[in-house]
């Protein structure tokens, strides 16, 4: 079930403040965030966010195609190492 239109997109307040400060100062520093649930807004385009994946901050450069998506979609939380190789096939 999607979010109601009348509510509008969810963005943590501190994230908006940090993005506005970065845009006004012109600095290109990475903005660290733990808010994976926040929606990417149009004013975030061109900024780099460090989205926490539970282990470290993954750098995410926001482009126009990402607007409307959540930050968590771009920082995977699980690492798939691959399936175990067949030991019998390796010996031959």
From Swiss-Prot:
Q: Which molecular-function annotation in GO is an example for this chain?
A: rRNA binding
Q: Which GO terms describe its cellular component?
A: cytoplasm; small ribosomal subunit
* PROSITE patterns given in the database record: RIBOSOMAL_S19
User: What keywords would UniProt list here?
Assistant: Ribonucleoprotein, Ribosomal protein, RNA-binding, rRNA-binding
One Gene Ontology BP term is: ribosomal small subunit assembly
Q: Does the keyword Transmembrane helix apply?
A: no
Task: Give one Pfam family.
Answer: Ribosomal_S19
The lineage's top-level taxon is Bacteria
UniProt key word Iron-sulfur: no
Family to which this protein belongs: Belongs to the universal ribosomal protein uS19 family.
Give the protein's function.
Protein S19 forms a complex with S13 that binds strongly to the 16S ribosomal RNA.
Q: What is this protein called?
A: Small ribosomal subunit protein uS19
Specify the species.
Caulobacter vibrioides (strain NA1000 / CB15N)
- Taxonomically, what lineage is the organism? Bacteria, Pseudomonadati, Pseudomonadota, Alphaproteobacteria, Caulobacterales
């Amino acid at each position: 079930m999607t979010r109601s239109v009348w509510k509008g997109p969810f963005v943590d307040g501190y994230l908006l403040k940090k993005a506005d400060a970065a845009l006004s100062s012109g600095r290109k520093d990475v903005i660290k965030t733990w808010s994976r649930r926040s929606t990417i807004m149009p004013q975030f385009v061109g900024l780099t966010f460090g989205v926490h994946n539970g282990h470290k901050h993954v750098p995410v450069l926001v482009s126009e195609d990402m607007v409307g998506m959540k930050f968590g979609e771009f920082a995977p939380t699980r690492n798939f190492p691959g399936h175990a190789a067949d030991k019998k096939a390796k010996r031959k």
